Amino acid sequence: LSEPGEYVPVDDQEETSFDVSSINIEENGNRSPINYVLPPGIEQELDNTTTTQRQQNEQSLVLKVCNLKDGDSRAAYKRSDIDMRNYKRIKMFVHAEGKEDNLKNGDFSCFIRLGTDFSSNYYEYEIPLDITDFGSTRAEDIWPQENEIDIPFEIFQDIKQERNSNSENVFLPYVKYV
């Protein structure tokens, strides 16, 4: 994001399009030009609500954006009452592909925000994305390790303690590149 805080996109409805949907193994396993496969190390869970052993339909969130201006961003939000202090880390597999072969690694980034609001009480973690080549079929190529978000929550505590020990203004965003 170009500025910290809650993001309100400018009115460019004619230029940038943004769609949120889902993709799944059952309906998109033969998708072209890149088929949908499970991320490395992930197995489909069994549906324990039936008497027959059946695998659940594993799926992922799709954020599809076209004509995004440099420095602009789009996001999907989920509000939740989950207390993250009960967990040690958050892990997310990220895949990036272009409509055509005109994207390069690092042209886009993925960010995740965790916090109580989107203006002053949040942590944000961002990584540049590697683009998957058309025709890729291996899970390791479709879900490259460089695109994996794996955040130990203790890093947020460490950064907050660092900010406080440096006597930084707690009312201004504190940025740490790791």
Question: Residue locations for each model-derived region?
Answer:
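Extracellular/surface-associated beta-sandwich interaction domains
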Residues: 1-178
